[in-house]
Curated annotation (Swiss-Prot):
Disordered: region residues: 524-560
Modified residues (Phosphoserine): S496, S536
Protein name (Swiss-Prot/TrEMBL): Interferon alpha/beta receptor 1
Sequence similarity: Belongs to the type II cytokine receptor family.
PANTHER family xref list: INTERFERON ALPHA_BETA RECEPTOR 1, INTERFERON/INTERLEUKIN RECEPTOR
Compositionally biased residues, Polar residues: 529-540
Signal peptide: 1-24
GO function terms (MF aspect): type I interferon binding; type I interferon receptor activity
């Protein structure tokens, strides 16, 4: 038992006590005085330097603080060793302070008393290891745990039903696959494999006091071979209007089922509870994998249910026990999510109730909160937030980026974390930012400029092609100016006309003078017309012949 000591000890460094020095005797002294309390076991231990002195014993007294009534400490009188057990001391109250004193003795000689600092037994007590009993099934182990101490323990009399037990279990063949579970005094460990040796150890805890006990010794047991009739699995209980619906999975037909219930608080009380399970109405000898029973069977509280199967070959073990709370069991459907981009760096999210949700009392009786998971579509990094509002905004986002969101409804301040499944995932892209607009405008302008440049280059290219392969029938103006004089225009006349000489018989000299003046005017007019027609590239004989026509007219008039 002393090997278990060490977590909660009272260690005192005592001064020496000295026996009267006699002839050949040495001084006697004590060094570390320690008090250990485990459950209802009390131990006093000290170190002494008087081993070389023979016939030295030690005795201790105790008293309740403030009574001034020292009594001999049972089990600690005339002790020759350096420890004693005073568990037989009769203490009426473990919350009262106790004083201890100890001295050394040799014959009729005694040292002075050394008084230990007063202590409260309950505050110094260490929780001891619980006692464990095991029973095996094919896929489970039944635990029966006795609280630390004895049935009439004074130390834990008020806490026997407050203990919680932590179990560490592993396969005997591999200690690396350890699994830790919190269990009740009468409980089961599920999800095991048939015909496997499992080992476990258990420790007790008082969570409200933050006190943790010692582990029990290691216990090992073999699970049985696979049972011929398997147990039902995936037991669930839901609410449908004014009734409960209990469902489970089972692989075979032609099987009957039975379901039972138990109040949850009974599992906290040590002892057997197999006879306290009660039959659920309408769930006995049913041939379907579900049964329906009225809600008024259960008052407000927490319960456990279990199911087992039967056929002509036998009866299965009980299924895994399912806990449910009558206050929060109504079904919560997943919400409907919508998301809209409002700016370049924010998205607005709206949460609404599902159309399938018919039990509106859930929203009225229990306030809901929404667990929202938000992430960038190209990233696995998720942001999880709890929102009481049905409309909220995610700010500080990237422009032109796709974000996704999903959510589920939870009952606020629910310690069992009951909630719906997650909604469908909704994704939305943020709007372009100012920088994006600037780049967009710049891109459009660049594209337009590029188009104009391309058009200009194409036109120049086409003109070059036309000039090379399809030249104009008219000579250019620079060439045409050399052909603007009168002698050159005569080249365009026919050969016959060029070789013809015109002769005139002039009888009146005055007419000749008028004709010459007229010809001078015509020449001036011709020169003007020639300059005006150089750019057009057109050649005309009209001006060239105008002089001759005028001369002919004058001749005709003269002849008349």
């Amino acid at each position: 038992m002393l090997s278990l000591l060490g977590a909660t000890t009272l260690m005192l460094v005592a001064g020496r006590w000295v026996l009267p020095a006699a002839s050949g005797e040495a001084n006697l002294k004590s060094e570390n005085v320690e008090i250990h309390i485990i459950d209802d076991n009390f131990f006093l231990k000290w170190n002494s330097s008087s081993e070389s002195v023979r016939n030295v014993t030690f005795s201790a007294d105790y008293q309740i603080l403030g009574t001034d009534n020292w009594k001999k400490l049972p089990g600690c009188q005339h002790i020759t060793s350096s420890k004693c057990n005073f568990s037989s001391v009769e203490l009426k109250d473990v919350f009262e302070k106790i004083e201890l004193r100890i001295r050394a003795e040799e014959g009729n000689n005694t040292s002075t008393w050394y008084e230990v600092e007063p202590f409260v037994p309950f505050l110094k007590a260490q929780i001891g290891p619980p006692d464990v009993h095991l029973e095996a099934e094919d896929k489970a182990i039944i635990l029966s745990i006795s609280p630390p101490g004895t049935e009439d323990s004074i130390m834990w009399a008020l806490d026997r039903s407050s203990f919680r037990y932590s179990v560490v279990i592993w396969k005997n063949s591999s200690s690396l696959e350890e699994r830790t579970e919190t269990v009740y005094p009468e409980d089961k460990i599920y999800k095991l494999s048939p015909e496997i040796t499992y080992c476990l150890k258990v420790k007790a805890e008082l969570r409200l006091q933050s006190r943790v006990g010692c582990y029990s010794p290691v216990y090992c047991i073999n699970t049985t071979e696979r049972h011929k009739v398997p147990s039902p699995e995936n037991v669930q209980i839901n609410v449908d209007n004014q009734a409960y619906v209990l469902k489970w999975d089972y692989p075979y037909e032609s099987t009957t089922f039975q379901a039972q219930w138990l109040r949850a608080f009974l599992k906290k009380i040590p002892g057997k509870h197999s006879n306290k399970w009660k039959q659920i109405p309408n769930c006995e000898n049913v041939t379907t994998t579900h049964c329906v029973f009225p809600r008024d069977i259960f008052s407000m509280g927490i319960y456990y249910v279990r199911v087992r199967a039967s056929n002509g070959n036998g009866t299965s073990f009980w299924s895994e026990e399912k806990e449910f709370n009558t206050e929060v069991k109504p079904i919560i459907f997943p919400p409907v999510i919508s998301m809209k981009s409002i700016t370049d760096d924010s998205l607005h999210v709206s949460v609404s109730a599902s159309e399938e949700s018919e039990n509106m009392s859930v929203n009225q009786l229990y306030p809901l909160v929404y667990e929202v998971i938000f992430w960038e579509n190209t990233s696995n990094a998720e942001r999880k937030v709890l929102e009481k509002r049905t409309d909220f905004t995610f700010p500080n986002l990237k422009p032109l980026t796709v974000y996704c969101v999903k959510a589920r409804a939870l009952i606020e301040n629910d310690r069992w974390n009951k909630g719906s499944s997650y909604s469908d995932t909704v994704c939305e892209k943020t709007k372009p930012g100012n920088t994006s607009k600037t780049w967009l405008i710049a891109g459009i302008c660049t594209a337009l400029f590029s188009i104009l440049v391309v058009i200009y280059v194409v036109r120049v290219f086409l003109r070059c092609v036309k000039y090379v392969f399809f030249p104009s029938s008219k000579p250019p103006s620079s060439v045409d100016q050399y052909f603007s004089d009168q002698p050159l225009r005569n080249l365009l006349l026919s050969t016959s006309e060029e070789q013809t000489e015109r002769c005139f018989i002039i009888e009146n000299a005055s007419i000749i003078t008028e004709i010459e003046e007229t010809n001078e005017v015509a020449e001036v007019h011709e020169e003007y017309n020639s300059q005006a027609s150089q750019d057009s590239g057109n050649y005309s004989n009209e001006d060239e012949n105008s002089g001759s026509k005028i001369s002919e007219e004058f001749l005709q008039q003269d002849s008349v």
